[in-house]
Amino acid sequence: DNERYESVMNKKILIAENPSAGARDKQSLLSDLKEGLIERGYQVEQESDQKRIQDILAIGDSTNEEKIECVICAGGDGTIGFVANCSAPATPLAILPLGTENVLAKQLGFDCDINRLMDKIESSKTFALDAGEANGQLFLAVASVGFDAEVVRLLSARRTGHIDHTTWIRPILQALGGYRFPKIRVRTEGNEKAVHARWAFVFNVPRYALGLRFVAEGDFADGRLDLCCFRGGRWWNGLRYFVGVLFGWHRSWRDTHVEQVTQIVIESDEAVPYQLDGDPGGELPVTIRVLPGRLTFVGRSPVADS
C-alpha cells in the first residue's frame, strides 16, 4: 500500500461535476469518490463552474507542474462532451455516470462503482476513442438533426435543475404538436447526389438512448462515423421508425439510408435544429467529420474485451 501511495503521490485529478445532471443530487457519491482518491494519495480538485474547469485544463495542458493525471466527468453525456472540448487529446478521461441516459458510459464500461473507477485510474491503462466534430464542436456519442433535436432544444429552453425520463414528456408532446419535419439534404463523400430526408443521425458509438441500435457497426475506434437517415415525415412515421429500430428492421426499408462516412454536410432551406450528445448544437447547415483517436479514456478498451 505504501508503494502504491508513493507512485500516485502529487498526481492531480480533476472531478468536473455537472450539479444538475440526472434525477437527483449525487453529492454523497462524489464526496466518497474524492475521499477515496485522497486516501490513495492523489491531489483532488472538484469543480462545477465551467469557466473554472476550462481554466484548470488549459493550465494543466501547458505546464508539467499542473499536469492533470485524469479528469473524471461526473455527469451525463453532455458533461463528457463539454470536458472533451476543453481537453487535450492525450488527457486521460474517466466517467462517473450521473446523467439520465449515460449512453457513452454504458458502452465504455463505466458505472457508479467508485472503487472500480479508482482502480481503472490507478492502473494507468488507457485507450483511444474517435470523436465527431460538428461545426468545430466535439461530440462523442451522437449528433442528430430533426425531431429529436427539436425535443432537446425545447427541453434545454425550460430546464432548471435535475431531470429524469419523465422530464422529456412535455417537450416531446410540444414537438409532436408543432414540429413540421422540414426536408434536409445530406451530402457525403461516398455519394455524388445528396440524400433527401427529414431525420438524420450520425453515430460514433453503436447505441442511442434506451439502448436503441440504429446502425450495425458503430465502432468508436474505426475512424468512421455511421449515418442513418429517415425520409418520412409526420409523427406516425416516427412511431414506425421507432418500432423498426427496436427490432432491427429499418435498415432494409426503402425510406431508410445507412452509410459509413468520414465527413458529412447537412443543410436545409428552413431553420432546422441539430443536437450533440443531448445538448443543443445550433441550426443547419452543419459540417460533421470524424477525428480518429481524438480522445483518451482510462481502463481497457471495450473493443479489446469484446
Regions found by a protein language model. Give the residues of each.
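Short glycine/serine/threonine-rich phosphate/pyrophosphate-binding segments
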Residues: 78-83, 103
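ATP/nucleoside-binding phosphotransfer catalytic cores, i.e., glycine-rich phosphate-binding loops
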Residues: 26, 188, 194, 219, ...
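Gly/Ser/Thr-rich active-site loops/lids in small-molecule metabolic enzymes
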Residues: 159-167, 208-211, 216-237
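Glycine-rich phosphate/pyrophosphate-binding beta-alpha loops
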Residues: 144, 148, 201-215, 280
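A generic structural signal for short beta-strands and their flanking turns/coil linkers
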Residues: 180-182, 196-198, 221-226, 260-262
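ATP/NTP phosphate-donor binding region
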Residues: 2-71, 81, 119, 304
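Catalytic core of DAGKc-family lipid kinases
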Residues: 14-16, 40, 47-48, 86-199
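N-terminal glycine-rich "phosphate-gripper" loop used for MgATP/nucleotide binding
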Residues: 73-77
